[in-house]
Amino acid sequence: MATIKDVAKLAGVSTTTVSHVINKTRFVAEETSKTVWNAVQKLNYSPSAVARSLKINTTKSIGMIITTSEAPYFAEIVLAVEEHCYQQGYSLFLCNTQNEPEKIQNHLDMLIKKRVDGILVMCSEYTRNSLELFNATNIPMVVMDWGKAHEKNDRIIDNSFNGAYLATRHLIDNGHKDIGVISGYLTKTICSERLEGFIKAMKEANLPIREEWILEGDFEPESGFEQMNNLLRLDKLPTAIFCFSDTIALGVLSALSEKGIAVPQDISIIGYDNTHSSRFFSPPLTTIHQSKSRLGVKALNLLLERIKLGHKEYQPHTIEFHPELVLRHSVRNLNKSEE
């Protein structure tokens, strides 16, 4: 395997000159530079990435720790981050944790050994232990938190309350008075805020809120499927269901399809997140849009800013998003039915 000394000997220059040409750290005459590159190609010389990173104090790599990249919501954020990393000349190490402290610790250790320039942390929830692990490292880091503000964490404000209010108002405006909910874990801030938005819209319209129609899932299709079947066992069904995620709605649609119940003819469904696949559901899902790509890009830009600052003190940032209603074909207008 060729070394930098071999390149220097063939090009008739010093190893220092070869280093400056390859790393572009100093001006080198065009003719000399061309001679060096010809020698590099002839010898098939490949500089050691580790050696270069030690010399210029950067590996041009980013670590990303997330709950799971399988969930459509996180998958779309990861895609945006990876694409933006590529555009900025960075490689991305992706680490799934399933919110397990041991995995978080192991992934952190691995990223530190890889000498990544920075770490982007984006989990659906944090334990005190995981936050302590993140805060203990000196690597530039952006910790995105959907929950209450923490001293060192950057916060995402997705206005879940407003999004849920918007979704519920859409159902009410389409003549629905009996509305059910299938949520994620209500201990999570985003879910409790969405439930509050639902309740506000219902109370403003003087509509009854039936506790047996408020069911708790876990954001996965399986829980949507299971809770929809639980609803179907009741004597009276709602005319519409507000699902707190598109993945929950997918499970709900599957359960209804198995029972031969048509959407939206027999029951209306509205989702949340506007994941890429929601437009291909049967029927295409009316939902609440959140810009996952914009979130990913903003979070990465924030991290790149931290990397430039080095160890200087910085203030936590807030990234705020405003939900929008996306109209498709899963909600029936009952007002037209009565005309």
From Swiss-Prot:
Q: Which Pfam families match?
A: LacI, Peripla_BP_3
Q: Per its database record, what is this protein's job?
A: Is the main repressor of the genes involved in the de novo synthesis of purine nucleotides, regulating purB, purC, purEK, purF, purHD, purL, purMN and guaBA expression. PurR is allosterically activated to bind its cognate DNA by binding the purine corepressors, hypoxanthine or guanine, thereby effecting transcription repression.
Q: Which GO terms describe its molecular function?
A: DNA-binding transcription factor activity; transcription cis-regulatory region binding
Q: Which NCBIfam families match?
A: PRK10703.1
Q: Which organism is it from?
A: Haemophilus ducreyi (strain 35000HP / ATCC 700724)
Q: What is this protein called?
A: HTH-type transcriptional repressor PurR
Entry's PROSITE patterns? HTH_LACI_1 (PS00356), HTH_LACI_2 (PS50932)
| Binding-site list for hypoxanthine | 73, 188, 219, 273
Family annotation (InterPro entries):
HTH_LacI (IPR000843), LacI/GalR-like_sensor (IPR046335), Lambda_DNA-bd_dom_sf (IPR010982), Peripla_BP_I (IPR028082), Tscrpt_reg_HTH_PurR (IPR023588)
